Amino acid sequence: MRDDERRAWVEVNLGALKMNAMMLARSAGVPLLPMVKSDAYGLGVAQVVGALESLTPWGYGVATVDEGAELRSLGVKRPILIFTPVLAQDYADIRAHGLTPTFGDEARIRAWQSSGGGDWHLAIDTGMSRAGAPWRLVERLRDVLSSAPPEGAFTHFHSADEENDSFDKQLKRFDVAVSQLPWRPRYLHAENSPALERQTRSRWDLARPGVGLYGVGRGLTIRGDEVLGMATTWPYLPVASLHGRIVDIRDLAEGETCSYGGTWVARGTRRIATVSAGYADGVRRSLSNRGVALVNGVRAAIAGVVTMDMTMLDVTGIDCQIGDVATFLGRQGNEELLIADVAASGGLSPYELLVGLRLRANRVYVDS
């Protein structure tokens, strides 16, 4: 038993990550700008970027100045874009680390230019209503954009994974906004992972995948060759799995309760296994009495409330012993718990479930 697999651990398959990135790049047909914010979605930015570097992405996307500075400390030389609005007090650190900010209002664009300028990208709001210049009002920025032209411009699709008309609306709005710029920036980018899944080639200069890199989504349609013209469906490879070890097994009689609040009550004699992984390790509390884990390839229901350090499973009829592995995300034998399915059972988004893996559990990296 490895020391980092004694209690609870997250296994990160860097080989699967690289394959997902390769397929995303092939599908998009343009260089990638991978999103590695929030410690690479909870999976470890140093190892994730180390794996992605072998695929020569155009650059990386982060959420904060500190995240960008961390990439520079890791030796990353490529462009690093900060996708959340920054304040004037951040400008010195941004320049010190060679980062690229994004702006969507005249005041900050002028402040950036007057304080020394440098590369920046224009954020255009086409419906997310979170940040960026409203698409209808981009024309009002023509004067400042002429004096401080952006290196790039982008938008963000809010519902590309939904079967409605919002994606097409945002596409048209982005096209309209770009047409109002004094001239076309060198780089246009918009597609997140769900947007890339909707089409077989990027419309712009860069593609900006996030969660698809990490194995979450419906997969890609890969273009066929020019002769046959056949397309291939490519499902993402799972990248992350979450495991703990059984540390206690006991039998409960009819009517006995399990965990805080006594919300789980034994109906007949039941066998309960306690696993050394709780919500401080990434087993979300919302999975209490709803989720499952895999024990020796068999699904075992979570019994009662997930606690900070331990989770109890109903293993009645399952052959298991202390020291066996319980899997909360990932595969055992012929059974697999996918991130999207586990998130749905706990009323979570897959993104929320992923970033929760950056908590206490050890990370174990494999390349297969």
Show which residues each predicted segment covers.
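Active-site-proximal beta-alpha core segment in soluble small-molecule metabolic enzymes
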Residues: 2-4, 8-11, 15-19, 29-180, ...
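Active-site anion/phosphate-binding pocket segments in diverse small-molecule metabolic enzymes
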Residues: 1-21, 26, 31, 67, ...
